[in-house]
Design a protein with these regions (language model features):
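First exposed extracellular module after export/assembly in secreted or surface-exposed proteins
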Residues: 1-175
Length: 175
């Protein structure tokens, strides 16, 4: 389980002088906007795109977006929670029944042979399996956190530094 905390900057507070002529760290006044619990999931590792298809990581439906906008106009994008959790605000369509929500699974897949030694980009595939759901009556949005600690560590070991970019490949359909 991970959490998402959103705060809003209110104002700076003046830095105060400590003994010895050094300054204390800057303080900030912030307002808590929201806090949410996010379920966490393991990230799948496969050696190639072909193995992703063969290892039964089904993709039976597209998602709508990874940049969801709420009723107040606030857009949520994927973010890192520390260096170990990648949080995705995933939106998809489904039948308007609670039991159908349980049918939908989202798997994040890392393909080991996709990066070369000079790569600065880490690529994941998001696979949406709709189960037995056959309708697209309503939008569903969920924040899902994926454990990427081992992948980040392996990337740093292979490339000498952490990635500068994370790309998520997913089938998208807005209709």
């Amino acid at each position: 389980m991970c959490c998402g905390i959103k705060v809003k900057y209110v104002e700076d507070t003046p830095a105060t002088k400590a003994e010895g002529g050094t300054f204390t760290p800057q303080d900030y006044r912030i307002k808590l906007v929201s806090a949410i619990a996010v379920d966490s999931y393991s990230t799948k590792h496969v050696s190639s795109v072909e193995n992703m298809e063969m290892e039964a990581i089904p993709e039976t439906a597209p998602i709508v977006t990874l940049e969801s906008t709420d009723n107040y106009g606030q857009t949520y994008k994927p973010w890192m929670y520390g260096a170990e959790m990648l949080v995705l605000p995933i939106s998809w369509k489904m039948e308007n029944k609670e039991e159908m929500l349980k049918q939908h699974t989202m798997e994040l897949v890392y393909i080991e042979d996709e990066s070369n030694e000079s790569s600065t980009e880490l690529v994941f595939y998001l696979r949406h399996n709709k189960g037995t759901d056959t309708k697209t009556d309503v939008f569903a949005v969920r924040n899902k956190a994926y454990d990427v600690k081992k992948i980040m560590s392996d990337f740093k070991e292979k490339h000498g530094s952490y990635p500068t970019t994370i790309r998520i490949k997913a089938k998208i359909d807005m209709d």
